[in-house]
């Protein structure tokens, strides 16, 4: 168990190094490998097949904390990588960001990335929700403010079109 936690840390570090070098595909591979090392170790997740195979010793609180921190960091970093790759898979960015937010609801980077994903998936209400939360945590972040402004413009455009539609229907 300790070995798998250490291996996951090494893969995560390789992913971080690749990210710094702009090798996003390799970074994604490193983060995925780290998560694979951790699969099945998380006691808070139900096992797909209970009581199958040998039951390992329970994690210590420190190991469980390291497990959750590593998982959260990997998901957050995966979302960051995917935003740098073409074409961007916004569904995955959304999914990974939400996994981070399950454990760290105040994570400003994950809130921002979720907002960006929802914006590009044209779910502007959800985008606004996440971007407002991000701007509350990082009020000076220009990227967050820019996406929030773009989201507000899309929402007001949508509401104008909706109003015109209803006026046309009901005169």
Curated annotation (Swiss-Prot):
Record keywords, A-Z: Repeat, TPR repeat
Superkingdom of the source species: Eukaryota
Any Pfam family the entry gives: TPR_19
Presence of the UniProt keyword Repeat in the record: yes
Renumbered ranges of TPR repeats: 8-41, 72-107, 108-141
Similarity comment text for this entry: Belongs to the TTC9 family.
Protein name per the record: Tetratricopeptide repeat protein 9C
Organism: Bos taurus (Bovine)
This protein's encoding gene: TTC9C
